[in-house]
């Protein structure tokens, strides 16, 4: 059995035509040659196989399915599951998408058709291979079945009658496999027949059309292929790896292959399913949910599998074998690459990722008999190998019965290798000796020849021939002498060895006390006798299963070795082998059963036996050596005698020949003497050898005596071995008896234990019954007593009733309650004893937290998915708009109109890109939501039981030990459900109330609209007002008042507090006063002499004309400026939480059109006289600000009832906050003024802004401070006043100062004269940055997305240029800075907020931020130069602060701080484009970077984490970190003091200023602190050589003078 994980393959289908037309983007990416897929930008999944969009069908099959089909023929089950959302290509991948009218192409065949082809092709190959090998042809049986699971009913797709689903039952057979009863199983014989069955079944499958798929599968389909085969079983392998030959045996294998085509998961919202389709979708999702629960249980944490809910669904029951059972399983997860299906694709990948953790236990489905035969064969092979190892001595059994490798085996291996090594060495030495002997002979021959040649000889013709003959003769004699010497040396060494052996045997014999006699025994006969005894002993040993080797063969093999040294080594090896075999037999007996009593005796016998055997072996070896030595000496003696005789003969022959030749007598004598000397030497050697021979004979006699001793020892050895065998037999018998006794004792103990257990259970059952009986009796007794008491009380009551005294009624009433309380109290006591309330409370807390976590996760995911769906719908709408505009562009011939269409198309494409970015961002958020929630919960959760925290909710409920604990949890769960239901009902009630209120407001708005229509119609102002209202505003009047409520831009909340101090008389005009005024007060004439009187009811009969006018007037009355272009542009990003804008940017509007439409209404230009007169009756916006626009009294009621109502209701509005709605909507209420009702909402906003401005105006002045705050470093000298709201920014040059405020103004000041020079216009929103341009007469003011350049040389301070964040440059006269417009809370499309800006020290470059980048401007040419790239790490972040400086070399350096905590350095040139960061300062801050300051070779950075960091500009390393430099987050940094000795100044949100000494050391030293230097936070600071200026949220600027001046 082998564990194998479920294989998972991911297949991404190609995009469809509809998805491409809808503009869906690909949200998945696959790494090449790597099974990894990435979704959402950074969420990656790794599977066993990943197939991207262009993957063909055959690649999918060959990569992961083909090997499963091959395993089918080895008896292994297999399953292929196709999972995914509807329309993701599951049916196409599996190959069941058949069309009766279309023939399917070969390359389009799916997994199932290809598997069928592969199966029958493999069958043919197996039969052909068997025939080639001469084996029996295997027999195959193939059958198929095809079922579908429709609405949780199993239907047979191959059956003619598919209505009988109740007859199909799911069972589990004896082997644990799932089988279906009642399903038709058809036998197939070829591929075509199987394909026909598959096609017919696929056509019977339930399909239907949905919004996502024209042919959507409405059921789960399972096609099963059964294969049975009978083949020749393979023989087992031997040690060499070859198959053993033997009888042929057959084996039976059976396997099944499930092809599962799961129906796709559906969302009713997207599929549009209703009725039966909806029911089918619900059933499909329920089955897939149960499948997901099974996968989650099998692939749980730490590999622990608890209860697996297979029975929750028929689908999981059918797939029980495939998931966690006996099957090789492959899941093919099909998904869509389109971002419109992003959520479903992500869920599919998560689903498949969990399936990878499942482990199946796979075994071959083999017949029982063939399986048993295979197991026995493998067992026999293993036993044979083990037996061989025991025979060879590789394994032995120690005293404890454990198998160990014999030490003698390792020793034998070592000695064998050593002998081989010595043999090679001896061979090499012999070769070397032969070479040296030859060289020695040559040298001696040459020496003798030279000595002979030096003798004087008589000249003869044959002298040269004689010399050669003499030389050859000398050489022969020398060779013979050398050979004789070597033999002599060998004989001497042998004699020495024999002497040593003799001395050793003498010492041994003396120690044994053996006195050798002169008994004459024949050595050979004694050896033969010893051999016979050994043979008898061997047979005796074999009779008791003691293996051994043939001793005679051992002796014969030892006698054949020629070398004495090697003979001794091999004899020792053979001797050790023999001892090893004998010891092995004894140890095999010892292995079986052991006896401590006999073990000691056996050990002593074994030791003595070993010693005697070794002595016998040594004697035998000495006898053999003596025999060999004797033969050798005899041979050498004969050789020496022959050589002496030959030498004498040769001598005589040489002398005779010399005498015949008549040579020199002296020479002959010399030769004769030399030969005589040689002969003498040889005779001496011969005498020595004869002496040795005599001594050898003595040794032989001694060895015969020792041989007698050997015979005696052998007889003793035989006796000892017999004793050993008897002891072993006795030990075995004792062990058998002990084992039998132990088994009997174990059986008896088990029986006793079982009886004890049964008795204990019986006792426990009886005790329980007795306890129940006692409780029942007690309860019965109590009830009887209670009834008796009730009866007695009833009788007493009856008697009292008869007597007229109603006593005892209370007792009757209270007795049942008392009885119930007693019973409940007893039950509660039992419950308290049954479980621990504290442990249940802990478990309940864990359950509540997990429920809250799951609910929170689901809420977040649903919210993100809804946001993603909204962006997808918006993208679809933009795509439709682009297509429509392109169509009109191709059809139109008007050049101007075509240009407009091109502009609209470009704008729509830009909007499309923005929407696509938002879609990508939402996808990334959805991918990261699980990790973020998990991390959040880990940080916020209290410390609880770790074991409980790791369990799921289901596991916690399943782990209830007692019924009381379950009741406890259910009670709390019931209470929790009631609380949540009550809360939900309350929220629903509030929602309905709000909806009713909205509806009421809509009705009131409609009524007021009708009133306004009637009023304006009576004054004939419709045509005149429509004349100057822009056409696009007229077209935009298509939505209801409720849509206006939703689309209105938020207004500034801070502006509302300025109207709260008005206290005026409240009077609200009623509808009767407006509709049914009398003739005196309801006249609509503003001037009786100038204008004719018009009756309100005079035009009632003019229905058509009045209806048309009403429509036009309705447009005029409900067209807000904030929504004029809300439908043509997309929503821009909102202001960040750290910006100095406090109003929220909502929709997008074009304020130029608004201003153009508002201007005529304010100035009265472009309007007819009648309309101008009607508008002139509105309150003037140019009155004296000291008086206020509502201080002036209107004419009396005689002028008109309208003006009276307007006057009264206007004062009413001042007492409320409805004029400045915090939500910025255009909805009206009953308390809104008539002025607000009779004028457009954008006009009301303008008037409201003027109201706020006039009532908050302060006198602009610079006031000296008496007794100002004084310290060691600086002293407060002056205070600048003049702004109505907080001052956000300040900058100075030599004589001038500029300030920017929340009141949307910037002011230019003369700091020497202490006066205001000029107010620099009204800006769209807060002026959060102001900057002087060095070496020029320009000053910049920054508000929202605009940077305005002002020339302050002229008294008017003209606006020269307007630079937008997008890089657009406008002329200064393109905006009318003198006009007062409403506060702009929206930004146009493609524009972003300028959150940071700075001018370089040369005055040539301007740096402005836009999102995560910084744009660089050339101020000489007024055009953008380039940008600083990636100033923040994330493109969703933005630059929060910016500073520039110049190096001594003239390079310009820019330092940026971002909201994602990082600070970067850029080196900027005049002709640069995209500039990458030069350095990134690490480590980053822990929060948003609020200020950066380069100062004296260092960079100081501050952040919301209230820390200040000091970096070196040389290497970019941090030198110091000042922790908690302030109590609140730091908003500004600047340097103060003389150059080179500046102090670092920091200011924070609570108005505190701190001075730091940063030059004396690497650390920062606090010099002085000015707490509460301002009442509110300090937003900005700047300084000169001796002055410090602080801009605060208390609408003032503080002037501080250095005390060192």
UniProtKB/Swiss-Prot annotation:
It comes from the Eukaryota. Its main location: cytoplasm. One of its GO terms (biological process) is microtubule-based movement. Residues 550-559, 1116-1152 have a biased composition (Polar residues). Residues 1200-1232 have a biased composition (Low complexity). Mg(2+) binds at residues 91, 217. This is Kinesin-like protein klp-12. It comes from Caenorhabditis elegans. The gene is klp-12.
């Amino acid at each position: 059995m082998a564990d194998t994980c479920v294989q998972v393959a991911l297949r991404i289908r190609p995009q469809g035509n509809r998805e491409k037309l809808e503009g869906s983007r690909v949200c998945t990416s696959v790494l090449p040659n790597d099974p990894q897929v990435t979704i959402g930008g950074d969420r990656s999944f790794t599977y066993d196989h990943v197939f991207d969009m262009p993957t063909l069908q055959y690649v999918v099959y060959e990569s992961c399915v083909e090997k499963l089909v091959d395993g089918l023929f080895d008896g292994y089950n297999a399953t292929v599951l196709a999972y995914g959302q509807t329309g993701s290509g599951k049916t196409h991948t599996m190959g069941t998408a058949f069309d009766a009218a279309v023939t399917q192409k070969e390359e389009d065949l799916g997994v199932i058709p290809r598997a069928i082809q592969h199966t029958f092709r493999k069958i043919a190959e197996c039969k052909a291979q068997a025939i080639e090998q001469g084996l029996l042809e295997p027999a195959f049986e193939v059958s198929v079945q095809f079922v579908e699971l429709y609405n949780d009913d199993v239907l047979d797709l191959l059956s003619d009658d598919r209505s009988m689903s109740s007859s199909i039952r799911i069972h589990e057979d004896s082997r644990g496999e799932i089988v279906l009863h009642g399903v038709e199983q058809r036998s197939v014989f070829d591929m075509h027949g199987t394909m026909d069955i598959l096609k017919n079944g696929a056509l019977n499958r339930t399909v239907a059309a949905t919004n996502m798929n024209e042919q959507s599968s409405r059921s789960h389909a399972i096609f099963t292929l059964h294969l049975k085969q009978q083949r020749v079983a393979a023989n087992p392998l031997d040690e060499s790896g070859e198959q053993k030959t033997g009888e042929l045996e057959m084996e039976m294998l059976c396997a099944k292959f499930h092809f599962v085509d799961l129906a796709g998961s559906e969302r009713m919202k997207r599929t549009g399913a209703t009725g039966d389709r909806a029911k089918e979708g619900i059933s499909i999702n329920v089955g897939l949910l149960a499948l997901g629960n099974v996968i989650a249980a099998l692939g749980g944490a730490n590999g622990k599998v608890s209860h697996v809910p297979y029975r929750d669904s028929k689908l999981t029951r059918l797939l029980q074998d495939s998931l966690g059972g006996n099957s090789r399983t492959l899941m093919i997860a099909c998904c869509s690459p389109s971002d419109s299906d992003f959520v479903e694709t992500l869920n599919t990948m998560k689903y498949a990722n969990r399936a990878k953790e499942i482990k199946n236990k796979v075994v071959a489905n083999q017949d029982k008999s063939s399986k048993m035969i295979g197991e026995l064969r493998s067992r026999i092979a293993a036993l044979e190998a083990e037996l061989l190892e025991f025979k060879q001595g590789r394994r032995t059994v120690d005293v404890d019965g454990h198998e160990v490798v014999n030490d003698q085996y390792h020793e034998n291996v070592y000695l064998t290798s050593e002998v081989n090594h010595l043999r090679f060495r001896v061979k090499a030495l012999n070769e070397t000796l032969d070479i040296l002997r030859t060289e020695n002979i040559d040298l001696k021959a040459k020496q003798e020849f030279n000595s002979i040649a030096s003798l004087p000889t008589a000249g003869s013709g044959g002298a040269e021939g004689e010399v050669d003959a003499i030389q050859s003769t000398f050489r022969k004699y020398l060779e013979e002498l050398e050979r004789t010497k070597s033999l002599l040396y060998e004989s001497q060494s042998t004699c020495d060895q024999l002497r040593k052996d003799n001395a050793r045997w003498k010492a041994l014999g003396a120690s044994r006390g053996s006195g050798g006699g002169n008994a004459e025994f024949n050595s050979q006969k004694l050896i033969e006798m010893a051999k016979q005894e050994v043979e008898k002993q061997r047979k005796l040993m074999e009779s008791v299963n003691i293996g051994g080797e043939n001793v005679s063969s051992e002796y014969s093999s030892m006698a054949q070795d020629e070398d004495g040294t090697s003979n001794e080594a091999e004899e020792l090896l053979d001797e050790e082998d023999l001892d090893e075999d004998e010891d092995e037999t004894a140890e095999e007996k010892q292995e079986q059963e052991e006896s401590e009593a006999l073990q000691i005796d056996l050990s002593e016998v074994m030791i003595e036996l070993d010693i005697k055997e070794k002595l016998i072996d040594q004697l035998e070896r000495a006898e053999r050596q003596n025999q060999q030595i004797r033969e050798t000496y005899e041979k050498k003696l004969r050789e020496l005698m022959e050589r002496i005789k030959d030498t004498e003969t040769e001598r005589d022959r040489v002398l005779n020949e010399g005498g015949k030749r008549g040579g020199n007598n002296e020479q002959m004598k010399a030769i004769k003497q030399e030969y005589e000397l040689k002969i003498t030497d040889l005779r001496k050697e011969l005498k020595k050898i004869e002496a040795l021979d005599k001594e050898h004979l003595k040794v032989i006699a001694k060895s015969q005596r020792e041989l007698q001793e050997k015979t005696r020892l052998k007889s003793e050895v035989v006796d000892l071995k017999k004793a050993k065998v008897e002891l072993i037999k006795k030990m075995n018998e004792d062990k058998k008896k002990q084992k039998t006794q132990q088994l009997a004792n174990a059986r008896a103990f088990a029986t006793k234990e079982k009886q004890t257990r049964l008795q204990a259970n019986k006792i426990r059952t009886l005790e329980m019954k007795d306890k129940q009986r006692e409780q029942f009796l007690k309860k019965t007794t109590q009830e009887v007593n209670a009834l008796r008491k009730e009866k007695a009380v009833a009788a007493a009551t009856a008697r009292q009733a008869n007597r007229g005294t109603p006593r005892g009624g209370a007792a009757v009433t209270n007795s049942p309650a008392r009885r119930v309380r007693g019973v409940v109290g007893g039950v509660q006591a039992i419950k308290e004893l049954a479980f621990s309330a504290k442990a249940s409370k802990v478990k309940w807390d864990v359950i509540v937290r997990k429920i809250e976590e799951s609910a929170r996760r689901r809420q977040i995911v649903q919210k993100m998915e809804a946001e993603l769906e909204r962006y997808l719908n918006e993208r679809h709408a933009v795509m439709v708009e682009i297509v429509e505009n392109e169509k009109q562009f191709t059809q139109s011939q008007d050049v101007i109109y075509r240009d407009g269409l091109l502009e609209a198309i470009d704008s729509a494409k830009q909007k499309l890109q923005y929407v696509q970015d938002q879609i990508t961002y939402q996808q990334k958020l959805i991918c990261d939501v699980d990790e973020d929630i998990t991390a959040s919960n880990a940080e916020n959760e209290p410390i609880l039981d770790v074991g409980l925290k790791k369990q799921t909710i289901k596991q916690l409920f399943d782990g209830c030990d007692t019924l009381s604990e379950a009741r406890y949890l259910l009670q709390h769960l019931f209470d929790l459900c009631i609380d949540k239901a009550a809360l939900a009902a309350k929220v629903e009630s509030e929602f309905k109330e709000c909806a009713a209120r909205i509806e009421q407001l809509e009705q009131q708005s409609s009524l007021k609209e009708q009133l306004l229509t009637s009023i304006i119609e009576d004054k004939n102002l419709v045509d005149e007002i429509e004349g100057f209202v822009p056409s696009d505003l007229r077209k935009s009047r298509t939505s209801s008042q409720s849509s206006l409520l939703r689309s209105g831009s938020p207004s500034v909340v801070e502006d509302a507090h300025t109207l709260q101090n008005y206290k005026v008389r409240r009077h609200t005009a009623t509808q009767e006063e407006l509709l049914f005024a009398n003739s005196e007060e309801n006249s609509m004439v503003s001037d009786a002499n100038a204008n004719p009187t018009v009756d309100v009811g005079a035009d009632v009969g003019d229905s058509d004309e009045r209806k048309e006018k009403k429509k036009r007037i309705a447009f005029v009355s409900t067209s807000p400026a904030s929504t004029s272009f809300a439908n043509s542009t997309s929503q821009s990003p909102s202001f960040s939480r750290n910006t100095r804008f406090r109003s929220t940017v909502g929709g997008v509007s074009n304020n130029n059109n608004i201003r153009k439409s508002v201007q005529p209404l304010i100035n009265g230009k472009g309007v007819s006289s009648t309309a101008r007169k009607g508008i002139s009756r509105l309150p003037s916006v140019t009155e004296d600000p000291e008086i206020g626009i509502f201080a002036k009294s209107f004419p009396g009621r005689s002028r008109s009832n309208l003006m009276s109502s307007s006057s009264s209701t206007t004062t009413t509005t001042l007492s409320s906050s409805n004029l400045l709605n915090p939500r910025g909507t255009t909805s009206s209420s009953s308390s809104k003024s008539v002025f607000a009702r009779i004028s457009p909402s954008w006009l009301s906003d303008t008037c409201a802004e003027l109201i706020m401005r006039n009532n908050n105006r302060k006198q602009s002045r610079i006031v000296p401070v008496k007794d100002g705050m004084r310290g060691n470093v600086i002293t407060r000298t002056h205070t600048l006043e003049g702004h109505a709201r907080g001052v956000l920014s300040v900058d100075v040059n030599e004589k001038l100062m500029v300030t920017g405020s929340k009141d949307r103004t910037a002011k230019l000041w003369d700091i020497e004269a202490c006066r205001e020079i000029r107010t620099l216009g009204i800006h769209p929103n807060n002026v959060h940055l102001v900057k002087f341009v060095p070496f020029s007469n320009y000053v910049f003011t920054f508000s929202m997305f605009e940077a305005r350049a002002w020339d302050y040389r002229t008294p008017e301070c003209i606006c020269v240029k307007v630079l937008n964040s997008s890089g657009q440059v406008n002329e200064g006269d393109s905006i009318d800075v003198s006009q007062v417009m409403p506060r702009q809370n929206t930004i146009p499309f493609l524009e972003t907020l300028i959150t940071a800006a700075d001018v370089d020290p040369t005055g040539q470059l301007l740096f402005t931020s836009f999102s995560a980048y910084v744009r660089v401007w050339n101020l000489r040419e007024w055009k953008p130069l380039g940008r600083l790239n990636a100033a923040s790490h994330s493109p969703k972040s933005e630059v929060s602060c910016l500073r520039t400086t110049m190096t001594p070399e003239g390079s310009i350096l820019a330092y940026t701080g971002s909201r994602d905590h990082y600070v970067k350095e850029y080196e900027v040139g005049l002709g640069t484009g995209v500039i990458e960061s030069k350095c990134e300062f690490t480590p980053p801050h822990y929060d948003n970077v609020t200020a950066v300051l380069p100062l004296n070779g260092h960079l100081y950075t501050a952040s919301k984490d209230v820390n200040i960091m000091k970096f070196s500009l040389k290497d970019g390393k941090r030198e110091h970190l000042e922790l908690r430099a302030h109590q609140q987050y730091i908003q500004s940094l600047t340097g103060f003091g003389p150059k080179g000795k500046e102090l670092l100044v920091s200011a924070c949100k609570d108005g505190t200023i701190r001075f730091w000494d940063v030059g004396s050391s690497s650390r920062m030293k606090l010099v002085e602190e000015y707490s509460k230097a301002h009442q509110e936070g300090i937003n900005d600071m700047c300084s000169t050589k001796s002055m410090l200026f602080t801009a605060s949220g208390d609408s003032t600027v503080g002037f501080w003078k250095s005390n060192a001046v």
